[in-house]
Amino acid sequence: MGSKEFYGGIEKSPNRSFLKAMGLTDKDISNGLVGVGVAWSESGPCNIHALSLGNKAAEGVSHSGMTPRLFATPLVIDGMAMGNEGMRYSLPSREVIANTVELTIKGHGFDAFVGISGCDKTTPGMLMGAARINVPSIVMYGGSTLPGYYMGKKIAVGDVYEAVGSYQAGRMTVEELKIMENSAVPTAGACGGLYTANTMAFMSEGLGMALTGSASPPAVDSGKTKFAFETGAAIKTLVENDIKPRDVMTYEAFENAITLLMASGGSTNVVLHLLAIAHEAHVNIKLDDFDRIGNKVPEIVNMKPGGPYTMAELNEIGGVPVVMKKLLDKGFLHGDVLTVTGKTLRENLNEIKILNIKQDIVYDIERPKMRTGGIKILRGNIAREGSVFKASASSVMKHTGPAKVFDGEEAAFRALMDNKIERGDVIVIRYEGPKGGPGMREMLAVTAAVVGKGFDRDVALITDGRFSGATRGIMIGHVAPEAFVGGEIALLKDGDVITIDGENGLLKASVSDEEFNRRRESWRPPEPKYSTGYLSQYAKLVGSASRGAVLE
């Protein structure tokens, strides 16, 4: 039901009175109403500029001949919540954002949706909401921060997390750490590396839901403001041609997005998010699809944390379209899929020119960074439903060692700080899954400390929780089934030998089925951590990470 049904006719005079109280005219109302959703907050720098971009998008909507209505969505700044109780709210915020889009658009009879996103969960939340309401929709990522500098070297906030471990290991002074802290995030915008926010920005173009080239301009770049206006203006074409999100986000579009994820070596969180968006779009993709595509697509993007570059530098050579053009030209993408431009992906990329310059930000397909995709799906007797490994950010593909088991992130972090972790160990952090956490926290404080102590080649970590996109090293997340529901990770003990084999997709413990069954007899699920509030509700409804951790 759109604005004509909500506000048309004599009987809807009272409804129109509310619109006219805000200065709208009959013509404004008859032009059609577009909800412009902005993930804006003063909670952190990732989204502090988003309101100005939302206003510019609203100008574009007006310029197209439709009437914009701005609204805000809530958000959680992952980097600020990291290592704290607040991180439990990060993944659940994705569902709240999707719900906010649905409530606002459907609750007010808006005809279309324009989304301006930013930090990690805002882009997937908006795409989930768009797929669910299935009215003409378009999104634009608000952009990342510019690189910071430390002693003449470009840095991002992930370097500060690792510096904490370096300080604890005596490899950095507190004064040096403070200098890095003060300079890592110099402007508004999301984290600059190919972490979750920027990987989801890649996905917005890969799915066809954002204008070509709109993802990469930094938050403070004038190009981002231009794209905000053009994004708003583009909604009229979508409405006139009745192009809806499920017309764009097809199975082939998701294959394109997974291909782009593998070629970029982006954040493992995006596996969760693509599964969740597909769920809302009624598209059946599974972890097997990531495995299948990842085994044939080379990794060609050389950005942090697996490389030295940031989104700002990718933008200098043409942005995400350069990556997609290289993939399309070699037959890795479906070129005939529809996009929010009203054109096919191939038509959009036909206009893209790859600069003939010497650079190592995006490799050629023939000479890739890795022969296969940057994310591996691992399975075995402690991950029967699967787990994820960011191979692009690890120089080690195989590791075998004794388990040191911790119930929760804090216990593992204390063990690291107390020098109780030795080279060769496999840290196991459990009861951090979607239900058990609840909220499936990211383990960046621990993983960064592992790297900061110089253990990134010698210590592995497995968890039913998540990892920040800034994570690097031998880190395996999303282990499913999770501990809280009785997954085998709940049955591991100190000293169990864990084998990680990224090349062959294997994650297993040297524990027989019979021994696991014996241990299960004495296992009991822990009491839920929350009995009231949103996290209590979330824990009751959320499903497995292997299905995107959606509410079921």
UniProtKB/Swiss-Prot annotation:
What is the free-text note on the cofactor? Binds 1 [2Fe-2S] cluster per subunit. This cluster acts as a Lewis acid cofactor.
- Origin: domain of life: Archaea
Pathway involvement? Amino-acid biosynthesis; L-isoleucine biosynthesis; L-isoleucine from 2-oxobutanoate: step 3/4; Amino-acid biosynthesis; L-valine biosynthesis; L-valine from pyruvate: step 3/4
Q: Please give the cofactor(s) recorded in the UniProt entry for this protein.
A: [2Fe-2S] cluster; Mg(2+)
Q: Could you state a single Gene Ontology molecular function term?
A: dihydroxy-acid dehydratase activity
Catalytic activities? (2R)-2,3-dihydroxy-3-methylbutanoate = 3-methyl-2-oxobutanoate + H2O; (2R,3R)-2,3-dihydroxy-3-methylpentanoate = (S)-3-methyl-2-oxopentanoate + H2O
Per the Swiss-Prot or TrEMBL record, the active site comprises: 468 (proton acceptor)
Q: Give the protein's biological function.
A: Functions in the biosynthesis of branched-chain amino acids. Catalyzes the dehydration of (2R,3R)-2,3-dihydroxy-3-methylpentanoate (2,3-dihydroxy-3-methylvalerate) into 2-oxo-3-methylpentanoate (2-oxo-3-methylvalerate) and of (2R)-2,3-dihydroxy-3-methylbutanoate (2,3-dihydroxyisovalerate) into 2-oxo-3-methylbutanoate (2-oxoisovalerate), the penultimate precursor to L-isoleucine and L-valine, respectively.
* The protein, known as: Dihydroxy-acid dehydratase
Organism expressing this protein natively: Picrophilus torridus (strain ATCC 700027 / DSM 9790 / JCM 10055 / NBRC 100828 / KAW 2/3)
- Highest classification ranks of the organism: Archaea, Methanobacteriati, Thermoplasmatota, Thermoplasmata, Thermoplasmatales
